[in-house]
């Protein structure tokens, strides 16, 4: 009887092609031992051959660095949004390729931001869209696994609600209080407390990542059988200052505490209003005025490992050392000045109230 590994590698042309790609990148020494360990894990858990193959695809893509997606079959699935996109199939699973945005000053780093942001979320245990860096016909892309399957519909937060809520859409300007009201009012949500917790935990991670574009259209729910479940986190291309393309400017910012602080305390702001205005992540979190936010901070902050995040950044071979240092600098300062500061302040208040 053949093992799962022998079944997968022997019978599946796509798997064999991924093996060839990984070997061409001199990853055989890493891939081999890791794959056997992965096989033993899945067999112990009694996974099927299909589950093994799908897992193996992720295993190889994560270790193969920049992949060339040019020759993968098209999925012929259309995607909206402002960025150029192409749908492809990897081992019969649909992926969306997002292209690097062009500006008069060069290419934006939205693809790298998408990749880093998604992987940070996954490091922290959030359900998040799988992403892989690569190229397509010579252009830089990030491959994002499509999590919309048959019978499942994505419903953005902007569109969630009962008819009674929809009638009041203009009233809801998506302040924090309004978000709470909307979530509590929607009786189709399967677990309202969990959804509320997840939203505020996502906000904490977005604060670390300096996400300037989390809005009611790029987070929401999966609808199946008329029930709503929180969707995986996706659309992280606005993290970590993707418009910053000038390395001389990066160096100036890193050498100037005032410039760093502007990018910590003042911008980017979140897209959700606080007291009628766009809110600074620092203002909202450090105010400690939202109990749900405080609980999210306690839940998320202790699990943030900057060392692992920096290792992830160091493995990206399409950005310079200056650019990597810029990412690390901004993450370090946002971690210390927004999250750690607020966490210490919160725990101090809790101790005083004991």
Which residue stretches match the model-derived regions?
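Phosphate/dinucleotide-binding and metal-coordinating scaffold of catalytic cores
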Residues: 1-204, 208-210, 221-354
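Canonical protein kinase catalytic loop motif
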Residues: 215-216
């Amino acid at each position: 009887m053949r093992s799962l590994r022998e079944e997968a590698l022997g019978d599946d042309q796509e798997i064999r092609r991924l093996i060839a790609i990984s070997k061409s990148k001199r990853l055989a020494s890493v891939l081999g031992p890791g794959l056997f360990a992965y096989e033993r894990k899945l067999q112990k858990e009694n996974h099927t051959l299909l589950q093994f193959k799908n897992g193996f695809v992720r295993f190889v893509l994560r270790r193969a660095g920049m992949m060339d997606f040019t020759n993968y079959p098209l999925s012929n699935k259309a995607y909206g949004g402002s960025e150029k996109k192409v749908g492809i199939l990897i081992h019969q699973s649909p992926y969306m390729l997002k292209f690097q945005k062009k500006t008069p000053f060069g290419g934006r780093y939205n693809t790298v931001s998408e990749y880093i942001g998604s992987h940070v979320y996954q490091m922290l245990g959030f359900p998040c869209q799988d992403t892989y860096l690569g190229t397509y016909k010579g252009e830089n892309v990030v491959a994002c696994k499509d999590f919309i399957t048959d019978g499942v519909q994505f419903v953005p937060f902007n569109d969630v609600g009962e008819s009674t809520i929809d009638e009041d859409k203009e009233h809801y300007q998506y302040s924090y209080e309004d978000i709470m009201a909307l979530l509590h009012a929607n009786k189709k949500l399967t677990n309202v407390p969990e959804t509320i917790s997840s939203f505020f935990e996502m906000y904490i991670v977005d604060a670390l990542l300096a996400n300037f574009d989390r809005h009611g259209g790029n987070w929401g729910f999966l609808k199946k059988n008329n029930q709503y479940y929180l969707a995986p986190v996706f659309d992280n291309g606005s993290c970590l200052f993707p418009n910053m393309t000038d390395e001389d400017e990066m160096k100036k910012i890193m050498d100037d505490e005032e410039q760093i602080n502007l990018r910590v305390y003042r911008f980017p702001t979140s897209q959700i209003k606080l007291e009628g205005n766009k809110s600074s992540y620092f203002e909202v979190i450090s105010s400690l005025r939202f109990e749900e936010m405080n609980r999210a901070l306690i839940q998320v902050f202790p699990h943030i490992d900057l060392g692992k995040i920096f290792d992830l950044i160091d493995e990206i071979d399409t950005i310079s050392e200056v650019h990597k240092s810029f990412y690390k600098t901004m993450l370090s300062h946002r971690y210390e000045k927004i999250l750690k500061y607020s966490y210490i302040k919160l725990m101090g208040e809790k101790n005083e109230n004991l």
